[in-house]
Amino acid sequence: MAVPKFKPSKSRSRTRRSINMRKKIPQFQECSNCGNLGVRHRICLKCGYYRNNQYLEIGL
């Protein structure tokens, strides 16, 4: 049966556990033009803008 030869250091243990403590990145971002919530790095489906440039003509 496998048994650890040495006690793992605090640094190694905490590094392994740190992945669970990482900050979550928000999946949605507010549109700079209309304020609608949408997927990041995509054209806004409500107004057709992305990075203050209009890419889609959306009839209101």
Swiss-Prot record:
GO terms for cellular component: large ribosomal subunit. GO terms for molecular function: structural constituent of ribosome. GO terms for biological process: translation. SUPFAM superfamilies: Zn-binding ribosomal proteins. The keyword Kinase does not apply. InterPro entries: Ribosomal_bL32, Ribosomal_bL32_bact, Ribosomal_zn-bd. Keywords: Ribonucleoprotein, Ribosomal protein. Pfam families: Ribosomal_L32p (PF01783). It comes from the Bacteria. The keyword Ribonucleoprotein applies. NCBIfam families: rpmF_bact. HAMAP family: Ribosomal_bL32. Belongs to the bacterial ribosomal protein bL32 family. This is Large ribosomal subunit protein bL32. It comes from Borreliella burgdorferi (strain ATCC 35210 / DSM 4680 / CIP 102532 / B31). The lineage of its organism: Bacteria, Pseudomonadati, Spirochaetota, Spirochaetia, Spirochaetales.
